Amino acid sequence: MTTVPPHSVQVHTTTHRYEAGVVPPARFEAPRYEAGIKAPSSIYHSERGPTTSQVLAVVAGLPVGGILLLLAGLTLAGTLTGLVVATPLFIIFSPVLIPATVAIGLAVAGFLTSGVFGLTALSSFSWILNYIRETQPASENLAAAAKHHLAEAAEYVGQKTKEVGQKTKEVGQDIQSKAQDTREAAARDARDAREAAARDARDAKVEARDVKRTTVTATTATA
């Protein structure tokens, strides 16, 4: 009776190849997320509150958009009011073409300005929404960078304020010196005028005395 040798298994560490009809064990694979399902980390980030960059974007964009919308509305209202007021004038003063042309140009400029302000405001709101939707979580030093920029802006404003104050002081000194020069010139002119008047008075007295003397002499000679 012959014995059948057992099946032998050869394992190669480099290729992981199995021979002699032995079925390799099943490998464990990490579960995949498909069909647009995000990983738990992204879910965690989506459940977090608004980041500093989003807050700064909203704070910076909302006032700009609101102001531009307000300017657009005011410009449109002013343009319409101007047209309502100017239309009867166009009908009455139709031969005057230059004012009509200027008014039409101003009206067109008003409409264009209103449209530009409105489009800019809408673009600002759209940018805010896109930025909030697509922005990534802010880094740790974002607050420090914002504080640094605010400090630089405050320093710049303080320096400009100091320069404006210095220029205002210099202009005030110049105005004061010019006023003093003007007062001195006026006083000098008044003094010269008084001296000229006194001199004219003396000359008039001398001339009157000479005339009187001449008259007396002529009367004496006639007598």
UniProtKB/Swiss-Prot annotation:
It is a multi-pass membrane protein. Residues 167-223 are annotated as: Disordered. Residues 214-223 have a biased composition (Low complexity). It is found in: Lipid droplet; Membrane. Keywords: Lipid droplet, Membrane, Repeat, Transmembrane, Transmembrane helix. PANTHER family: OLEOSIN, OLEOSIN 20.3 KDA. Belongs to the oleosin family. This is P24 oleosin isoform B. It comes from Glycine max (Soybean).
